[in-house]
């Protein structure tokens, strides 16, 4: 048996987002901060006593990949601190609140598809949360898949059907959502590489009036 027991580095501020995909879910749920928790391991899924935490702010346009990289660094630094505390007898584990616990279950394929009837903020969070993997996608009018890697929130309003391309500029295009309009800045057509929306527009990949997301 290990002298001090076993510890684990978990990429969330426990007890929120226990489970397999805490970074994805933090972005997808529009959280303003995430973090790392060093915890004692027990028989449950991320249910052990918490030893130390560090919080990290989540920017409006931060992606899952960017948050992952930041948490990786913070987690390594925190782990060294905790090991020193344990060896010095200074660690003070704290039990998790079951009432405050949430779970980040395994991602499923159906979660990747964009539902344009949702609010622009929710779709933006999905796109950020699935970048760089697995990627959020929609359907083009020709039935082919289009992954969307980059988006921005806008203050535009429209009465157009959700999924309708309501505007296209030299650099991006704008899609009607259930609430609001989302600016699309980076995409990946089926069987092609990621590209700026500008390149996609210039190639006549999408035009004003097209409706995305239809079967």
List each language-model region with its residue ranges.
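Short amphipathic alpha-helical segments
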Residues: 54, 110-112, 180-182
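An anion-binding loop in the catalytic cleft
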Residues: 116-215
């Amino acid at each position: 048996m290990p002298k001090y027991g076993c510890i684990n580095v978990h990429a969330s501020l426990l007890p929120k987002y226990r489970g397999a995909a805490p970074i994805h879910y933090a972005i997808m749920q529009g959280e303003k901060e995430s973090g790392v928790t060093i915890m004692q391991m027990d028989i449950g899924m991320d249910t052990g006593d918490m030893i130390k935490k560090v919080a990290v702010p989540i920017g409006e346009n931060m992606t899952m990949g960017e948050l992952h990289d930041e948490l990786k660094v913070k987690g390594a630094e925190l782990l060294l601190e905790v090991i020193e505390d344990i060896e010095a007898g200074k660690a003070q584990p704290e039990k998790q609140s079951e009432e405050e616990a949430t779970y980040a279950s395994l991602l499923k394929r159906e979660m990747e598809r964009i539902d344009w009837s949702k609010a622009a903020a929710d779709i933006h969070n999905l796109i950020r949360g699935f970048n760089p993997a697995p990627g959020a996608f929609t359907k083009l009018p020709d039935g082919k898949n289009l992954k969307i890697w980059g988006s921005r929130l806008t203050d535009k309003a429209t009465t157009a059907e959700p999924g309708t391309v309501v505007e296209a500029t030299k650099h991006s295009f704008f899609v009607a959502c259930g609430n609001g309009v989302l600016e699309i800045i980076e995409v990946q057509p089926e069987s092609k590489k990621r590209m700026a929306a500008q390149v996609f527009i210039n190639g006549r990949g999408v035009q004003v009036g097209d409706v995305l997301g239809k079967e």
